[in-house]
């Protein structure tokens, strides 16, 4: 199982390849705001752990294992952003909140959050009911 740091790299590499068709060390460093030498070290570790294949000066490709986990990590991130929107978290806080919790939730918890997102999205009245509860709670606290 990858560490949280490894997950961040795999997720970013997956997104870059999906967007551009490739992921270079410099692109990964820029996206994660880290030094290229840090990326090289992590990419070598990910290669050793068979999440990707890295050839110096030639680039990298995700293995089947890397693609599978990358897809799941992107799904997790997107799902948590959806969940935050449903529960009414301010848009400007969503990204940082998701980054803060995504590595600490089990896949079972992610699946249950997925069920909850699906439940709310199946009927807009449910979201409105939640908003009503939130407004009532805000009025009580003021």
Curated annotation (Swiss-Prot):
Keywords: Activator, Cytoplasm, DNA-binding, Manganese, Metal-binding, Repressor, Transcription, Transcription regulation. Homodimer. Central regulator of manganese homeostasis. SMART domains: HTH_DTXR. GO terms for biological process: intracellular manganese ion homeostasis. This is HTH-type transcriptional regulator MntR. It comes from the Bacteria. Signal peptide: none annotated. It comes from Bacillus cereus (strain B4264). It is found in: Cytoplasm. InterPro entries: DtxR_MntR_Metal-Reg, Fe_dep_repressor, Fe_dep_repressor_sf, HTH_DTXR, HTH_tscrpt_reg_MntR, Iron_dep_repressor, WH-like_DNA-bd_sf, WH_DNA-bd_sf. Its main location: cytoplasm. Belongs to the DtxR/MntR family. GO terms for cellular component: cytoplasm. It holds the Pfam family Fe_dep_repr_C.
